[in-house]
Amino acid sequence: MEFLTSGKVKDLYDVDESTLLFKFSDRVSAYDVKFKQDIPRKGEVLCKFAEFWFNELDVPNHFIKRESENEILVKKMKMLPIECVVRGYFYGSLVSRWKKGEVQVPEGTNTTLAAQLPEPIFDPTTKSEHDIPIDKNKAIEMNLVSEEQYNWLEKTSIEIYKKMAKITDDVGFILADLKLEFGILDDQITLGDSIGPDEYRLWPKDSFEVGKIQEAYDKQLLRDWLTANGYQKQFDDARDNGQEPIPPNIPSEIISKMTERYVTAYEKISGKSL
């Protein structure tokens, strides 16, 4: 088995001509900045969530099997250069982009923070160091996907979001948004990468309230702490000056809270204990 590359969270290994191994680490990143500290058990939760969702969703995917507490085997495929984001709530970057006039929201949208959208929207981005939002025309113009592929990705991504939202709703969570990646396997568009709290926002229903920052059972907890303490602005300022942002130390209470919430989310949604 040959080591291929390290991503923000996963290490990839070449197993054979048709198989990859994903090793999930406890690493964490936010706002495209990698942090020095780990989040204990995060890799295990992401790994087992990937197994759960791939088995739960009725859509062709690259998952073969879980190999260990933090490793899965997947089929190799050619990934499509587009990140398929589905948003069900007026939150996150959608809010700032809407305020700048960079994106339209469905007619009748309540533009109060965290309000549910009338219908989930497909809001894809490029796949790059800093993902750039794109629309259908741009995706086709940039030769990222064909029109037929785009239409399929939009329809399927929204269907997956709705199914996942129903599953999370049944156990007391709101799935606010979701990021999916697809590839081509045997001439068929196939769900790839992994699905877990690094790919979606998850809010507990019992504390949900429109107009406020929501309690996060995902990576948003770290993002909110960074924003509240001025670090997001520091990162942006550093990049504007051509410098690499310097990650601060994450407080121990944020680290332990992230571990606790990741574990709780998995146990409630999957019905299995870790």
From Swiss-Prot:
Question: What species does this protein belong to?
Answer: Nitrosopumilus maritimus (strain SCM1)
Q: Which pathway?
A: Purine metabolism; IMP biosynthesis via de novo pathway; 5-amino-1-(5-phospho-D-ribosyl)imidazole-4-carboxamide from 5-amino-1-(5-phospho-D-ribosyl)imidazole-4-carboxylate: step 1/2
Indicate the family of this protein.
Belongs to the SAICAR synthetase family.
Question: GO molecular function of the protein, one example?
Answer: ATP binding
Q: Which domain of life is it from?
A: Archaea
Could you list this entry's UniProt keywords, alphabetically sorted: ATP-binding, Ligase, Nucleotide-binding, Purine biosynthesis
Q: What is this protein called?
A: Phosphoribosylaminoimidazole-succinocarboxamide synthase
Q: Which Pfam families match?
A: SAICAR_synt
* GO biological process, alphabetically ordered: 'de novo' IMP biosynthetic process
Entries under PANTHER family matching the protein: PHOSPHORIBOSYLAMINOIMIDAZOLE-SUCCINOCARBOXAMIDE SYNTHASE
Recorded catalytic activity of this chain's protein:
5-amino-1-(5-phospho-D-ribosyl)imidazole-4-carboxylate + L-aspartate + ATP = (2S)-2-[5-amino-1-(5-phospho-beta-D-ribosyl)imidazole-4-carboxamido]succinate + ADP + phosphate + 2 H(+)
Under Enzyme Commission nomenclature, its number is 6.3.2.6
